[in-house]
Amino acid sequence: MSESALNTAIQAIARGLPLEESVLEGAFDTLLSGEAAPEEVGAFLAGLTVRGETANELIAGARIMRRHGRSVSVEGPLLDTCGTGGLPWKSLNTSTASAIVIAAAGGRVAKHGNRSVPPKTGSADVLEALGLQLELSDTAFKSCLEIAGVGFLFARSYHSAMRHVAPIRHKLGIRTIFNLLGPLSNPAGAEYSVLGVYDKQWVTPMAEALKALGTRCAWVVHGLAGIDEISISGPTDVCEVTPASIRHFQITPSDAGLPSHPLSTLEGGAPEENTAAIRDLLDGREGPFRDIVLINAAAGLHVSGMVADLPAGVQRAAQAIDSGAARETLNTLVRTSRESD
């Protein structure tokens, strides 16, 4: 049935027809089982991209991606801070730095991420440069979470089925639905998240997908300056997701009691540059990177129910940095990742 489901899906996409849930799940199952021919993978992914993916397609894809992935069972509430990537410029690793700060402020963070394509630096690239052991057993991940308050889930280790579509994605050279599915597929099942998207058009569909997938509370965000995180350079579109509703609003840096900074002040580079920026941040350096980390960490603390609003979150995040707790959290995370197992 799965092979015919993929063919059915390709034909429906070509004709502009909606796809039934069973067909969608069968199509994704074929892709991630390695049963699809390269031309079928390309036709399906390119067709969805050209037509524009829907929330239902995101939901079906995430369900099958989770089913094919390796999961880790963790008790208690977990937060993920992640973004879709796909930005046209080299950025600093805001969500990674925010995860460390949130953990230092008392949160529990299951940070899901991957490498990026050079010259950009992904969360895995910068954490490895900071000394983290990326390939962790479930026991080692849990130790990091228990001892440091944050653990890293290396996407390549948990979603090995992606190897079946990776060559075609690379050859296509365009964003595909899998750029959106990764942030929806946290291996630890984090029920809280701050999820950044690279384009405003994905804010609502990703929010609808998170709601359907059982999220307890999340913010899907797009910085209107063109970034997949809460912006310190202008307004940010937000969809707040709870089991009962999806609420749309905008926030600005001033809502968190922070100044604005030009986007150009936040440009990153190679892992060494981004690593230095994180170390400087944790050593107390003030400036644009600190402020964008503060507002994104504040959102994570708020989504997790730890603070009432963004200003309170900024204050708590700043205390975590200025007290040295965030620096110690990073050191503990790195040490634990290397000592476990």
Swiss-Prot record:
Cofactor(s) for this UniProt protein: Mg(2+)
UniProt-annotated binding residues for 5-phospho-alpha-D-ribose 1-diphosphate: 83, 91, 93-96, 111-115, 123
Residue ranges of the TM segments: none
Signal peptide: none
SUPFAM superfamilies, per the entry: Nucleoside phosphorylase/phosphoribosyltransferase catalytic domain (SSF52418), Nucleoside phosphorylase/phosphoribosyltransferase N-terminal domain (SSF47648)
Keywords attached to this entry: Amino-acid biosynthesis, Aromatic amino acid biosynthesis, Glycosyltransferase, Magnesium, Metal-binding, Transferase, Tryptophan biosynthesis
Gene Ontology CC: cytosol
Pathway in which the depicted protein is active: Amino-acid biosynthesis; L-tryptophan biosynthesis; L-tryptophan from chorismate: step 2/5
UniProt-listed Enzyme Commission number(s): 2.4.2.18
UniProt: Mg(2+) 1 binding residues: 95, 229
Pfam families the UniProt entry points to: Glycos_trans_3N, Glycos_transf_3
Positions with a binding annotation for anthranilate 2: 169
Molecular function terms, GO-annotated: anthranilate phosphoribosyltransferase activity; magnesium ion binding
Binding sites annotated in the UniProt record for Mg(2+) 2: 228-229
Gene Ontology biological process terms, A to Z: L-tryptophan biosynthetic process
Cofactor: how bound: Binds 2 magnesium ions per monomer.
Catalysed reactions, semicolon-separated: N-(5-phospho-beta-D-ribosyl)anthranilate + diphosphate = 5-phospho-alpha-D-ribose 1-diphosphate + anthranilate
Protein family per UniProt: Belongs to the anthranilate phosphoribosyltransferase family.
Role, per record: Catalyzes the transfer of the phosphoribosyl group of 5-phosphorylribose-1-pyrophosphate (PRPP) to anthranilate to yield N-(5'-phosphoribosyl)-anthranilate (PRA).
PANTHER family (UniProt xref): ANTHRANILATE PHOSPHORIBOSYLTRANSFERASE
Assembly: Homodimer.
NCBIfam families: trpD
Protein name, UniProt field: Anthranilate phosphoribosyltransferase
